[in-house]
């Protein structure tokens, strides 16, 4: 397959309306999991001027103050005053959440936990490559870091005129499958009305972009598009409606890898849309970290109510040191990809999800309590089994 000559990925800030919705959904999930680790949660959020609307299906013994969780989340993002067009303390919160269908529950729940069926049919992908030190594609990795930097400078007061809503887009030129130079950066950020566009552009380039992207990636023809439409004072849910699950490419690999179509936020680990995508990243990252391949994409698929995956496929794009067939065999031997196995393997029944809902679910620092799918604790076992 021909390699891309250039590749572009985008990210959005925590104050982008779609990401607000994701964070609210995951904040509710976390609050429930604190009281009921085995709850069934599918929480969807819509945000628009002056209102947060919740819908979905939740079955739980937890008793949480949903409205308080919503308000705390919105205020924490930075929408805490009417001057910003949205105030978490005064916005309407409309709760339309119901219970999960018993027909779904009978297909998922089992007497033996290991036999837990998948919560739905579907296909999920995981990916890793040696482009960056976190084994992620460079465009999405740097796009996320730019948005984190924008939030850091906003929260610290270093650039006090910044507001919560922002977007980034990064284009790298590639040679022999590796990023070699920065072709273009697009960064649009909401701001106070007093700041001039000249001041804004200089600050964004010098204080946000240059500290994040390695100096050797810049070249004379690198293009900067900073707030290219000019003023960006009206933003967040006033400017656009936000919905849970509308940034699935931002959440994953920036388009560099395939996507099965299922969103993550607001879903408990019994939903393989989320848990199997996390497991796919865990598998692919350990394969690349172990040196079995320089690039790896895995696809897994499921049938509702069935524990074992209906398929496991691997693509190493010609970079493998062993056969793809051997890698699939090693995946089956070293990774339990049944829904319960994934939850146990990655310690997913814990309230850690809100922090995943902005700046990407992958390429973050992994630990035993957060982003567990980023750990590379299978490397030695894979090396030994592959004879490397």
Swiss-Prot record:
Return the annotated region ranges for Flexible loop: 100-110
Residues the record lists as binding Mg(2+) = 18
Protein name as it appears in the record: S-adenosylmethionine synthase
Q: What class of enzyme is it?
A: transferase
Q: What Gene Ontology cellular component terms go with this record?
A: cytoplasm
Q: Which Pfam families match?
A: S-AdoMet_synt_C, S-AdoMet_synt_M, S-AdoMet_synt_N
The Enzyme Commission number assigned here is 2.5.1.6
What is the gene name? metK
Per the similarity annotation, which family is this? Belongs to the AdoMet synthase family.
List the pathway annotation.
Amino-acid biosynthesis; S-adenosyl-L-methionine biosynthesis; S-adenosyl-L-methionine from L-methionine: step 1/1
């Amino acid at each position: 397959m021909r390699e891309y000559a250039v590749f572009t990925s985008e990210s959005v800030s925590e104050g982008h309306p779609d990401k607000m919705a994701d964070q609210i959904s995951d904040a509710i999930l976390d609050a429930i999991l604190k009281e009921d680790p085995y709850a069934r949660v599918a929480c969807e959020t819509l945000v628009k001027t002056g209102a947060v609307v919740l819908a979905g299906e939740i079955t739980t013994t937890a008793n949480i103050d949903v409205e308080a969780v919503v308000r705390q989340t919105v205020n924490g993002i930075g929408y805490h005053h009417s001057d910003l067009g949205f105030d978490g303390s005064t916005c309407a919160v409309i709760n339309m959440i119901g219970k999960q269908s018993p027909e779904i529950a009978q297909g998922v729940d089992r007497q033996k936990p290991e036999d837990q069926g998948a919560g739905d049919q579907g296909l999920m992908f995981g990916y890793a490559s040696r482009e960056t030190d976190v084994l992620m594609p460079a465009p999405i990795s740097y796009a996320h870091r730019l948005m984190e930097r924008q939030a850091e400078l906003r929260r610290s007061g270093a650039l006090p005129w910044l507001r919560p809503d922002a977007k980034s887009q990064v284009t790298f030129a590639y040679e022999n499958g590796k990023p070699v130079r920065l072709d273009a950066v697009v960064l649009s950020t909401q701001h106070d009305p007093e700041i001039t566009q000249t001041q804004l552009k200089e600050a964004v380039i010098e204080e946000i972009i240059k500290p994040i992207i390695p100096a050797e990636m810049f070249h004379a023809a690198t293009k900067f598009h900073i707030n290219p439409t000019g003023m960006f004072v009206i933003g967040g849910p006033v400017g656009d409606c936000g919905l849970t699950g509308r940034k699935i490419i931002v959440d994953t690999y920036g388009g560099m890898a395939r996507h099965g179509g299922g969103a993550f936020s607001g879903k408990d680990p019994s939903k393989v849309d989320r848990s199997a995508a996390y497991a796919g990243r865990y598998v692919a990252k350990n394969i690349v970290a172990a040196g079995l391949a320089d690039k790896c994409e895995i696809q897994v698929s499921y049938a509702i109510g069935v524990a074992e995956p209906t398929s496991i496929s691997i693509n190493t794009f010609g970079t493998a040191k062993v056969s793809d067939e051997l890698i699939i065999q090693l995946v089956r031997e070293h990774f339990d990809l049944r829904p319960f196995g994934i939850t146990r393997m990655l310690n997913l029944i814990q309230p850690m999800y809100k922090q995943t809902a902005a700046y990407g679910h992958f390429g973050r620092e992994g630990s035993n309590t957060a982003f567990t799918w980023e750990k590379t604790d299978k490397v030695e076992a894979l090396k030994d089994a592959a004879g490397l």
